[in-house]
Amino acid sequence: MPLDLALKRKYYEEVRPELIRRFGYQNVWEVPRLEKVVINQGLGEAKEDARILEKAAQELALITGQKPAVTRAKKSISNFKLRKGMPIGLRVTLRRDRMWIFLEKLLNVALPRIRDFRGLNPNSFDGRGNYNLGLREQLIFPEITYDMVDALRGMDIAVVTTAETDEEARALLELLGFPFRK
């Protein structure tokens, strides 16, 4: 039996028809849709201690349900004591059902757990219909308990859409339930 992905169902049953009405698309393939969600964690301190990378990878795998890929330094920078090829971060690309599961968890559980949360910044679109947000700590996700955490690590989340303008992307994400600041 397939998973019941409420957010995915909402997209097909409510959001897509509303976007067609609002922007007057001729074809359903013109309607903006979510392509992927990329979660990135920069771990500069991992160059001194490999255990930091392992612990962060374990936490990110719990949050996303997928093993993260290690990102490595493209070139050496002596001021940062960095050599080409050193592991300096983690990245996970979520598509299809895992993407919908992650977004549902982000919107319904994680974001409401942020202290003093007043909404997402509506200016964080990149001009090409993609949205980026940064989180300061991994504790807001239900899979991470306080006892597991050795250090607070933030992450960047990029929501990649097929929208061609920020206006279309914002309409898509608002209809999906992203809580933007007014």
From Swiss-Prot:
One of its GO terms (molecular function) is rRNA binding. Part of the 50S ribosomal subunit; part of the 5S rRNA/L5/L18/L25 subcomplex. Contacts the 5S rRNA and the P site tRNA. Forms a bridge to the 30S subunit in the 70S ribosome. Keywords: Ribonucleoprotein, Ribosomal protein, RNA-binding, rRNA-binding, tRNA-binding. This is Large ribosomal subunit protein uL5. Belongs to the universal ribosomal protein uL5 family. HAMAP family: Ribosomal_uL5_B (MF_01333_B). InterPro entries: Ribosomal_uL5 (IPR002132), Ribosomal_uL5_bac-type (IPR020930), Ribosomal_uL5_C (IPR031309), Ribosomal_uL5_CS (IPR020929), Ribosomal_uL5_dom_sf (IPR022803), Ribosomal_uL5_N (IPR031310). It comes from Thermus thermophilus (strain ATCC BAA-163 / DSM 7039 / HB27). GO terms for biological process: translation. GO terms for cellular component: ribonucleoprotein complex; ribosome. It comes from the Bacteria. The lineage of its organism: Bacteria, Thermotogati, Deinococcota, Deinococci, Thermales. This is one of the proteins that bind and probably mediate the attachment of the 5S RNA into the large ribosomal subunit, where it forms part of the central protuberance. In the 70S ribosome it contacts protein S13 of the 30S subunit (bridge B1b), connecting the 2 subunits; this bridge is implicated in subunit movement. Contacts the P site tRNA; the 5S rRNA and some of its associated proteins might help stabilize positioning of ribosome-bound tRNAs. NCBIfam families: PRK00010.1.
